[in-house]
């Protein structure tokens, strides 16, 4: 699915495929190694996790890559050795002055790019919802729920283990680059671990002051939620009362299930009721 969607979007830029066993992937030339590709801006990596640091180093140092989406899993969420590999990946990215989404994620989608390796692929529209999720798998369940309610999306971000960029960082990006005319004013969040509560509070509050509405789930308030969170980040659930206080202070509408989250987002799409009888 991911290759097909990248190929469909290739009119927006040149696409390089690396596959040691193939010379052609769905009509696109395939290179045997990352050493053979031309310089490129973005690398989407889905290979055995033990090979990630070495491949990323070649891409960063020799091919000028400044953005990485790492889909590969089996890293810090599973073992200590996996955590060491993650740190090596981060060191490569930071040394190159690059950006990293992941690992252990499905990546991102927006109106110009749909290169994820899974389904469903929702409809994208400028007036759709911006959705940031710690978990790729849970993001898909939430998207499925949203589709039954007719929700469209402006962007979808899956940050996985959040080695460099987490939910708070994506929210900061949206806040600092917010365009009141062009950008969506509805945000949905699925958060497994709040690593930077001050950043979350500041940028959520700022977006809300700019006219946005934010609904969020904080995983870990139930036993099943705790298991879901630990499967992606190894995170220990935050104090529920602290989460409640943070969300209230920021102005975030707290939800406790995917159905509640997508229902609240659907309500956000409705026009405000005005008039003397309101």
Regions from the language model: what does each represent?
Residues 3-4, 8-278:
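Catalytic-core regions of core metabolic enzymes
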């Amino acid at each position: 699915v991911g290759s097909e969607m990248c190929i469909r979007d290739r009119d927006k830029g040149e696409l390089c495929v690396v596959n040691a066993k193939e010379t052609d992937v769905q009509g696109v030339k395939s290179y045997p190694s990352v050493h053979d590709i031309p310089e490129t801006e973005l690398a989407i990596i889905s290979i055995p996790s033990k090979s990630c640091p070495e491949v990323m180093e070649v891409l960063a140092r020799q091919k000028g890559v400044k953005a990485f989406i790492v889909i590969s899993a089996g890293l810090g969420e599973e073992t200590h050795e996996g955590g060491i590999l993650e740190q090596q990946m981060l060191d490569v990215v930071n040394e190159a002055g690059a950006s990293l989404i992941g690992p252990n994620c499905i990546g991102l989608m927006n109106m110009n790019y749909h290169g994820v390796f899974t389904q469903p692929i929702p409809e994208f529209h400028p007036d759709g919802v911006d959705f940031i999720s710690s978990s790729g798998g849970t993001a898909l369940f939430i998207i499925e729920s949203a589709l039954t309610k007719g929700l469209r999306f402006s962007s979808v971000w899956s940050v996985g283990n959040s080695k460099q960029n987490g939910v708070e960082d994506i929210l900061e990006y949206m806040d600092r680059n917010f365009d009141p005319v062009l950008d969506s004013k509805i945000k949905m969040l699925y958060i497994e671990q709040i690593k930077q509560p001050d950043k979350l509070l500041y940028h959520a509050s700022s977006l809300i002051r700019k006219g946005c509405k934010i609904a969020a789930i904080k995983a870990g308030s139930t036993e099943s939620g705790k298991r879901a969170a630990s499967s992606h980040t190894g995170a220990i659930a935050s104090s529920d009362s602290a989460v409640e206080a943070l969300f209230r202070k920021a102005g975030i509408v707290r939800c406790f299930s995917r159905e509640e989250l997508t229902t609240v987002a659907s309500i956000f799409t409705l026009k405000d009721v005005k008039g003397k009888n309101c």
